[in-house]
């Protein structure tokens, strides 16, 4: 087992990885920008190394600085967390080339699944269904028009290297195809340094269902059930729950088995998530995330398994201790993503947290790096807390989440807590009758 792990991330996810390491008796090294010198993960780590100025490109996205910090601290392994360099194949290779263990899948699998066209082809060969779309990138305008016509409008234009809704646009009629593609190209280049696009069929009312998987790299594979991430705004997840209120036992068992079969055939190592659109009883693969997900606590709450510990153990070369029969999913879990944003305009709200009180009680978990006196930086993602609750069933879970939201105090900045209170009182949410467009079409958000 590792003696010392460098955590190449910040905020609540860095703190989450730190806690898992502590539980395993592993020392931690925090890296931070100058803006994060007082961050909680820095305060709690055994060691910390400043890796650059506030801008992410000069600190948390600076692979060379992170490697230098690992050398200075004498770390054995590097955990990339979520976002930043967690799905960067070149960084994974750099980590291994310098003699450290990358806590994640192989660079080959990161690269394979990072290219959405390649990923769809591979997944299709493995027997999972995909959304109808182009077999290759949309090159010239004429080629794009032909592809869209063959697929049938409406279509969705997507960045090959994309994620998080960036470089993506819906095209309802042929006249707007080229202008939407131009916008998506510019956004993709700015976000990912790659303006390659592809086109696929736009589904009108799908749910977003994802399956949490693990592989040992030698053909062993397990899954932890599904999560429903359909409450979204501009392709960004707002609320996640597990299990999905839309699936019956047969559909749940089928997609879990098919996902683990794909992991087994890929000989995939570590944590991964297969994301699907689900419409009219059919699943359609959209992408595989080759890392831990922000919403992983939902799966932890219904399974009782620490997924970060599983990541670390597999990366250390230990045999996968769990088999599918060992994973018993109980009750229901919901996660509300609390962002430092105005709850109506969604304008960012950085600033000083003048008062902080987290909710508690049975079945309540808060993953946050906030504390009274902490200053929320304008330089990074606005997510400041994940409020997760677990109960015996969905109705009790909703009641518990309402109670937890009422207890939660974050003063000095605006947050989306009022939005979550509203959503948990909406009739469609209470009945489980929603899709990925619901938040925008029904509530106009």
Residues of each region from the PLM?
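ATP-binding N-terminal substructure of ATP-dependent carboxylate-amine bond-forming enzymes
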Residues: 1-126, 138-146, 396
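ATP-dependent carboxylate activation and anion-phosphoryl transfer catalytic cores
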Residues: 7-23, 48, 71-73, 89, ...
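Structural detector of well-ordered beta-strand residues that form the stable sheet scaffold
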Residues: 29, 79, 101-103, 131, ...
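Diglycine-centered glycine-rich loop/turn motifs
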Residues: 107, 132-133
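A polyampholytic, Gly/Pro-enriched intrinsically disordered region
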Residues: 122-131, 153-154
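Catalytic core of soluble alpha/beta enzymes
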Residues: 133, 141-143, 147, 174, ...
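Acidic/histidine-enriched active-site and ligand-binding environments that engage anionic O-linkages
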Residues: 147-156
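N-terminal nucleotide-binding beta1-loop-alpha1 segment
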Residues: 159
């Amino acid at each position: 087992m590792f003696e010392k792990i460098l955590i190449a991330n910040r905020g609540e996810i860095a703190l989450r990885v730190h806690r898992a390491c502590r539980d395993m008796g592993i020392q931690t090294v925090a890296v931070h920008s100058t803006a994060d010198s007082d961050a909680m993960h820095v305060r709690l780590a055994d060691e910390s190394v400043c890796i650059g100025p506030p801008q992410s490109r000069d600190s948390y996205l600076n692979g060379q600085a992170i490697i230098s910090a690992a050398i200075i601290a004498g770390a054995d392994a590097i955990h990339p967390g979520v976002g930043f360099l967690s799905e960067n194949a070149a960084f994974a290779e750099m980590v291994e080339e310098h003699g450290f263990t990358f806590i994640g899948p192989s660079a080959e699998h990161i690269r394979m699944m990072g290219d959405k066209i390649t990923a769809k082809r591979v997944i299709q060969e493995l027997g999972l269904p995909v959304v109808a779309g182009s077999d290759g990138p949309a090159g010239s305008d004429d080629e794009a028009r032909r592809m869209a016509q063959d697929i049938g409008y409406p279509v969705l234009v997507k960045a090959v290297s994309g994620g998080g809704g960036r470089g993506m646009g819906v095209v309802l009629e042929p006249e707007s195809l080229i202008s939407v593609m131009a916008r998506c190209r510019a956004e993709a280049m700015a976000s990912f340094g790659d303006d390659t696009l592809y086109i696929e069929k736009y589904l009108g009312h799908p749910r977003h269902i994802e399956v949490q998987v693990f592989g040992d790299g030698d053909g062993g594979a397990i899954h932890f059930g599904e999560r429903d991430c359909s409450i979204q705004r501009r392709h960004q997840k707002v609320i996640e729950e597990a299990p999905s209120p839309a699936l019956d036992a047969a559909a749940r068992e089928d997609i879990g088995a098919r996902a683990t079969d794909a992991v087994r055939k890929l000989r995939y190592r570590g944590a991964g998530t297969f994301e699907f659109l689900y419409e009219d009883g059919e699943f359609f693969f959209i992408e595989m995330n080759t890392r831990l997900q922000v919403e992983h606590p939902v799966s932890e709450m219904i399974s009782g398994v620490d997924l970060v510990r599983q990541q670390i153990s597999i990366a250390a070369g230990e045999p996968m201790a769990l088999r599918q029969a060992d994973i018993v999913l109980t009750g229901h879990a919901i996660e509300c993503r609390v962002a430092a944003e105005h709850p109506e305009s969604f304008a960012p709200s950085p600033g000083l947290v003048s008062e902080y009180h987290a909710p508690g009680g049975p079945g309540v978990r808060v993953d946050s790096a906030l504390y009274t006196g902490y200053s929320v930086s304008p330089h990074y993602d606005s997510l400041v807390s994940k409020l997760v609750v677990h109960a015996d069933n969905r109705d009790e879970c909703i009641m518990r989440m309402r109670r937890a939201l009422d207890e939660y105090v974050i003063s000095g900045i605006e947050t989306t807590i009022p939005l979550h209170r509203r959503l948990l009182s909406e009739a469609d949410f209470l009945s489980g009758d929603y899709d990925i467009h619901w938040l925008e079409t029904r509530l106009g958000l």
